[in-house]
Amino acid sequence: MKLNPDQLLRPAQYVEKFLVTSILDGTYSTGASLPNERRLAAQLGVTRPTLREVLRRLAGEGWITIHHGKPTVVNNCWQEGGLSLLSTLSKYAAYLPNGFITHLLEVRLTMLPPVARRAADFHPKIILGFLDKARNLTENAQIYSDYDWKLQMLMARNSHNPVFSLILDDFYSIFTSMALIYFSDKKARQASRTYYRELTLAIDSSPAAVEEVVEIAMQQSISIWQEVRCRSGGSCIIDPNRNDAGGL
């Protein structure tokens, strides 16, 4: 007998999945009240302490507001959530609204260029050593996804500011799920190879050149992502002025 994937979850995980996906898909819209604790626990088949534990954690992240003696209310998580909400969101990439990945890439466009510049300034040999491995990448989406993620984290961890790596690490699950889609496209892999070569040359030139190369590549990756999503049946917003070079 084939088990439902939800049957493999621990009770707290099941409650989290039910509540988060119900908020993301609009079952519980912003401002809506959740069923009372007794009713919701019975509906989900969990104990009230388990439900209470998950509710408190989701409230801390900004998903809901608990009013003692009154119904628990669903927040506008996009406006009231904190950074910890990203870690929870990353588990449910299939439920994210259209355009959310593009918004994340825009955040990375703002953050990663100065991070790369700092890393190239402080530890150029470390970054160059890793970039040298790009020559051995095979035409495989998983391999490109792993390499590109490790490059970003390497730059963040060598920027001499630990906050950068903490923020970037919150994107891990979302990034890896979308990167497999992105790097399944041959043009995306070619663009990334170009990016890695140009980044190598920029590090040998100057930190300012590094920042410029990364900024251009991150902007181009947004356009490439939108094109890939369009071809795979997602939303179609394509920048006709982009060049085909950029890593995800």
Model-found features: residue ranges?
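Long, low-complexity, charge-rich intrinsically disordered regions
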Residues: R157-H160, F164-D170
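C-terminal all-alpha effector/ligand-binding and dimerization domain
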Residues: R135-N136, Q152, D169-L248
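All-alpha effector-binding/dimerization core of bacterial HTH-type transcriptional repressors
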Residues: Q79-L154, T194-I216
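Short loop-to-helix capping motifs
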Residues: N36-E37, H160-P162, S205-S206
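Amphipathic alpha-helical interaction elements
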Residues: R56, A116-A120, A156-H160, L180, ...
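Juxtamembrane/interface motifs at transmembrane-helix termini
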Residues: Q7-L8, Y14, R52, R56, ...
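Short linear motifs at protein or domain termini
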Residues: M1-T110
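Solvent-exposed, charged/polar functional surfaces in cytosolic regulatory/catalytic domains
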Residues: F18-S22, T110, P114, K133, ...
